[in-house]
């Protein structure tokens, strides 16, 4: 979704991860792919505005967002975060104007999309369980909820996002 918004002049803030690249992903475009040691050093250095680790079927994967990138973000910047990542950034940068749009997917849509990108069955199940816990009761914190289920027209989803952001 963030990449699609680039067609409308928005810039994606590229986040960091230690997980292996998937087919078609590119260094410094999809993510900044770094080693676990480098990631942990960046945590110690206070580099991240927010970060999270996941215990996956392939090991521990870390994800995080650069504090500097968030501080330098403008009104045309987009970042994908977990609810806790959003909370962490709001806490660290309370004066930053951040609009939170929750892209809701039902479980069937999540399963299809995760499987389509090549995740195995165990990883799909782990991810869904994790997301259900992470996003529980998050609707009340979001500024806008946009439903993005299977069969939803991508242009319709983009229009709802743009209409909301441009009115904010």
Residue ranges and their predicted role:
Residues 19-77, 83:
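ATP-dependent small-molecule kinase phosphotransfer cores
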Residues 13, 32, 99-101, 144-147:
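Hydrophobic/aromatic beta-strand patches that form the interior of the parallel beta-sheet core
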Residues 112-119, 136-168:
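NTP-dependent small-molecule kinase module
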Residues 78-83, 93-117:
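Conserved phosphate-donor/acceptor-positioning beta-strand/loop module used by diverse small-molecule
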Residues 1-3:
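Post-Walker A alpha-helix
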Residues 23, 87-89, 108-113, 154-157:
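Switch/connector loops and helix/strand junctions flanking conserved nucleotide-binding motifs
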């Amino acid at each position: 979704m963030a990449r699609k918004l680039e067609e409308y002049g928005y810039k994606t803030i590229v986040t960091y991860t230690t997980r292996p690249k998937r087919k078609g992903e590119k260094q410094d475009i999809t993510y900044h792919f770094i080693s676990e040691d480098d990631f942990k050093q960046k945590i110690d250095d206070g580099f991240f505005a927010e970060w999270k680790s996941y215990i996956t079927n392939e090991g521990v994967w870390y994800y995080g967002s650069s504090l500097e990138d968030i501080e330098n973000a403008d009104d045309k910047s987009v970042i994908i975060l977990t609810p806790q990542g959003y909370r962490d950034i709001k806490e660290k940068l309370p004066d930053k104007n951040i609009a939170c749009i929750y892209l809701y997917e039902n479980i069937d849509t999540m399963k299809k999309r995760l499987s389509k990108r090549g995740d195995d069955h165990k990883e799909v199940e782990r991810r869904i369980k994790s997301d259900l816990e992470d996003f529980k009761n998050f609707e009340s914190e979001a500024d806008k909820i946009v439903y993005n289920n299977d069969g939803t027209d991508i242009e319709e989803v983009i229009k709802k996002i743009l209409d909301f952001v441009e009115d904010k």
